[in-house]
Amino acid sequence: MEFNTLLMWIVGANCGMLLLRSVAARRWTGWATVALAIMLSMAAAWLIVPQRVGWVTAIPWTLFVLLPMLGNGLLGWLVARHRYRTAYLASQLFAWLHPFDGGWNLPRFVQALEYTFHGDLEQSRRLLSPIAHDRSALSNLARVLEYRLEGRWDELLSWIQHEAREQPLRDPLLIDGYLQALGETGRRHELLHEYQRIVLQEQRVDDAFQTNLIRMRVVAFCGEVAITEKLLAGPLSRLAADTRQFWLSTALQAAGQADQARVQFEQLASGPDRQLARRAQLRLEQPLTVVATERTPEELAVLNELARTIGHETHYAVMSSTTRRQTPMTWLLILTLLAVFCLEIPGGATDELNLFELGALIVPTSLTPGEYDRYVLAAFLHFGWLHLLMNMFGLLWFGGRLERAWGGLPMLCCYLLTAIGSIVLFPMELSVLRSWGWAGNDISILVGASGGVLGLIGGLTGHLLVGLLSGRSALVWREFGILALIVTLQTVFDLNTPAVSALVHTNGLILGIV
């Protein structure tokens, strides 16, 4: 398999998914514009230089999609940890690579966050004001932050309700601000009603992190301490420690545990984040009203559904999981593959004779009678560095998620059984295909951990399938759809790439699901 072919598939699949996501969300974004431009350039390159399509499109894709996406994730990580100087430098690079969706104003926005952190609200407002009125994707966030700076929740409600009268709220940031404003102004019944309508029934928020952030605010204002803790320790663990403490204290205060809440708010009031300190002081001076002991049937129904959904997704929504649980078994397997590859290098990692001597499987197996160890050894050998890197990446991405869901030993068993099992089945299946005249009679050499990687995908697919059958969750459905799309793309790729064994991949996938 040529690197150019691999690049073409990676770029095409990623840009296609960006376009589909924008269409599904009914929001045309700058990411979709860039993806469409790259897809059009790919079509043009196919007509002009078909042998270089991957290389031609990989350059703009790397510059204007991959690097901005990585930078966006890094920026969020830095801001969450209050590293604003480094975040400002990263935002400047991001602004040049992705000036759409308000990206050009991102450095000013990060500066405003830094001034807010230090308590300089005047400078923060000076920077936010022009962003808030430029009608970009960043303007809504800037405007919500402006209202939040001084706790102008009634004004925020009025503005968002005015926006909602003109067109339904679809921006997750506006929905978050709207629901928080309802909670801050003590309108808990309306908060639960609107959450049920906008988030549960109409499903207008499709981002997993933003959905859980909204859920956390709702349950905190409703005094549901246990659910708040579960969210903050799980899918929202990336939030800064002081932010998590603030919202847990909010839940405690709403639940009537005033003494515990007061101690934590007093700690935050003297903390380094001056904006959060001011909000904590307001909680001390103007505490939330305690939630009524008796709830209405509607409120109980929403909160029970919330608790059930969060528990269900914590167990089954493994693709978007942000838990910090370590994955040592995944890394052990990656290091093992790397160590075995080092043994290939002296004799040549693409030299078939060298691979044969190291334990590659030869088909028909009658050429190596009784050498059953080849079924195992072949699963750890790779034909060149590109083959190795692809499987290492797949193992890291899918294996880590399955290990967090199942644990290290079950994940290892799934990997080994599918990697070896897919190779054991291959000679028998190939023999049947040859007897039907659907495959040639050439001698084949088989190496690679691809069956194991597809087995991990199969394991994740089966895990999500159990989640679909055992409960209702839009997030689990969405993750199942993403995996189904990955499997479809992988199948199309296998069928169009002669050097790749579609049989082994299919074996691994099916064994993993089972």
Which residues fall in each region the model found?
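C-terminal transmembrane module of polytopic alpha-helical membrane proteins
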Residues: L89, Y115-T116, A137, Y147, ...
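A detector for small-residue-rich transmembrane helices and their helix-helix packing motifs
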Residues: A269, R279-V514
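Alpha-helical repeat scaffolds
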Residues: T86-F94, L121-I131, R152-E166, R187-E202, ...
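Alpha-helical segment of the N-proximal tetratricopeptide repeat
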Residues: L67-H118, A142-E146, I214
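Generic helix N-cap/helix-start motif at coil->alpha-helix transitions
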Residues: F64-G73, F100-R108, H133-A142, Q167-G177, ...
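N-terminal signal-anchor/start-transfer transmembrane helix
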Residues: N4-A25
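Transmembrane alpha-helices and immediately adjacent membrane-cytoplasm interface residues
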Residues: A43-Y84
